[in-house]
């Protein structure tokens, strides 16, 4: 926990009226610096660091899809992500259609009335195939859906998916961002560009949320609504929190990212 000046200060923090540390499971000062640096590198408005890349991906899908919902995903993705979508999340009522991301007609045809996101990787793992991000972003947005991209292999040094239409970018920071094999971590970057209210598909983010004092995250956090929702609800309840020391180690890796990618 953190020290508050008085009860009003605490109430403002918990009510999202005043930005800052609330509770150690949600954020810490070292984590905050790491989040801001990766958000800046990706061109996003905010970010949320997690204990692993798998946690970042899982939280992202859980924030978008609930029981009865559907995801469209590139079929050539990291095996852990494939298993999450193909097997684990189906136990919670979220189903995925895997598509050839190079066949734009197939991508669009896979979208259903209950689809909540399109999911890609900038460089597919392990094939290193590169989808047409701009074209798929246009398809997703045409249907009122956010485009989620795993940029672990691409890194923001080589490509910034938000500039090509991605709405949410995720990383396993364990890989190129960390770079030294010393620590685990993940991160979710919010572009701030997706209109959660206009879409009408995401009441957990856009409407008053009964799990958080009736706050609408779209109203309270504005462009950073997506990662704020995950921090306040999913991280609070399930706790895949990055430790301050792991955030420090990932900051050290970020310092040399460009040199190592070169």
Task: Describe each PLM feature range.
Residues 2-4:
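Short polar catalytic/cofactor-binding loops
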Residues 47-262:
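Conserved PLP-enzyme active-site core in the AAT-like
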Residues 6-58, 80-88:
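Conserved N-terminal alpha-helix of the aminotransferase class I/II PLP-enzyme fold
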